[in-house]
């Protein structure tokens, strides 16, 4: 029952989005600007996620540079 309601909700959201896209050429400039801002924001988030995932995946492929380690001893009193 819950799966069918979820599918109906997704279908109704898709229908509303399609209707908005069809009415966009006749929309007011404010609506076009708001829609453009939402599209740019969504694209930016997706792009940043792809960059982050790519960086995390590729980071483990490269050999890590290990510097020379120096041992630290206790300080001698002056």
Swiss-Prot record:
Protein localization: Membrane
Recorded superkingdom: Eukaryota
KW Protein transport (keyword) present: no
Signal peptide: none
Coiled coil regions in record: none
UniProt keyword terms in alphabetical order: Membrane, Transmembrane, Transmembrane helix
Keyword flag Aminoacyl-tRNA synthetase: no
GO cellular component, one term: membrane
A Pfam family that the UniProt record links to this protein: SMIM5_18_22
Membrane-spanning residues: 32-52
Membrane-topology descriptor: Single-pass membrane protein
Database matches in InterPro entries: SMIM5, SMIM5/18/22
PANTHER family in the cross-refs: SMALL INTEGRAL MEMBRANE PROTEIN 5 (PTHR37344:SF1)
Protein's name in the database: Small integral membrane protein 5
Lineage: Eukaryota, Metazoa, Chordata, Craniata, Vertebrata
